[in-house]
Design a protein with these regions (language model features):
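A short, solvent-exposed loop/turn motif at the edges and junctions
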Residues: 54, 75-99, 107-108
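Short Pro-Gly-centered beta-turn/loop motif in secreted/extracellular proteins
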Residues: 68-77, 85, 217-225
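Short, acidic Ser/Thr/Gly-rich low-complexity loop/linker segments typical of extracellular
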Residues: 51-68
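Proteolytic cleavage junctions
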Residues: 20-26, 35, 63-64, 105-127, ...
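C-terminal motif of bacterial Sec signal peptides marking the signal peptidase cleavage site
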Residues: 14-17
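Hydrophobic beta-strand segments
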Residues: 50-54, 80, 154, 232, ...
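Sec-dependent signal peptide recognition
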Residues: 2-8
């Protein structure tokens, strides 16, 4: 992928072939279709044994990181998930056609330990080169909502806005639900995946009423187009859509936001989608398949 990331994102939004309705609920239409699913790690190596789920169907990738979904039930906005221990949640919302074969590529990110904090004092954690998380004191709870006092392991991965693999790493697609439940396209200025765990592996969260400050550096190529404020979005793994919650403020070359819970977070400017489609052909007039649009 060689084009600038914003251009790629815009085209990926156009390719979703949005309906005139602004609802996020797909049409109640089902049909049989097929999909070729390919899963890689951050180094481009195939990942075997990834559990792929589409509706009631599930299967596992082979040694080449591949699974072929043959003539299974899909809908016009099919949600596919990819899970394997040691990796962050992976998923894609794609737009198949009856009787056709779709191609879905995913890059799963390892759950990278980026730091350890003590809940009583809080602390600052660096995620990659461009994201900082600042935890306040006494802000971590266990799965039952009780205050947690042990060491907290912070696992995280950044997805910077100029990452050429952004679309393959991110979950879902770049369509989200606004606070009024209407649908919108999204142009990303960066994302981050974060999980908190105890020493025994218990999933932890931020205490209700508390927030973690996030500072996300914006690539220099995007500073000129960065709004003074943009909505923040978290990814709802159950529904498969990004959902608006809060906003980020531009301070220098960073967006600053306060996050009330953890999952994937996305710093995105909303924009209207349009209905768009195209057929690609070779010089001899034959139809081209699996064309990457950049």
């Amino acid at each position: 992928m060689k084009a600038r990331i914003l251009f790629f994102i815009t085209l990926s939004l156009l390719l979703v072939r949005c309906k005139d309705s602004e609802s996020l609920i797909p049409d109640p239409v089902v049909f049989d279709a097929s999909a070729f699913v390919e899963v890689e790690d951050l180094q481009g190596n195939p990942i075997a044994g990834v559990k792929i789920k589409v509706g009631d169907y599930q299967g596992f990738t082979d040694d080449d990181g591949v699974l072929f979904l043959k003539e299974i039930e899909m809908n016009p906005a099919t949600y596919l998930t990819a899970e394997k221990t040691g990796y962050f949640h992976g998923s894609r919302r794609f737009y198949p056609s009856a009787g056709r074969i779709s191609t879905v590529k995913l890059v799963l990110m390892t759950e990278q330990l980026v730091g350890t904090i003590q809940p009583g004092t809080g602390g600052t954690v660096q995620v990659g080169d461009g994201i900082v998380l600042d935890f306040p004191a006494n802000a971590i709870v266990d799965e039952d909502g009780q205050a947690f006092s042990g060491a907290v392991s912070v696992y995280a991965q950044p997805i910077m806005a100029d990452d050429p693999d952004l679309y393959y790493k991110m979950p879902g697609d770049l369509v989200g639900a606004r606070e009024d439940d209407t649908r919108t396209g999204m142009a990303s200025f960066g994302m981050v995946a974060v999980e908190l765990r105890s020493g025994s592996g218990e999933v932890l969260q931020i205490k209700g009423g508390s927030t973690v400050e996030m500072k996300m550096e914006i690539p220099s190529s995007l500073i000129a187009s960065a709004p003074s404020t943009v909505p923040m979005w978290y990814f709802d793994e159950e529904s498969g859509w990004w959902k608006e919650e809060g906003e980020a403020t531009l301070v220098g070359n960073e967006y600053v936001a306060n996050l009330p819970h953890f999952s994937y977070w996305n710093c995105d400017a909303p924009f209207e989608t349009v209905k768009w489609g195209a057929t690609f052909v070779y010089e001899d007039g034959s139809t081209a398949s699996q064309v990457e649009v950049c």
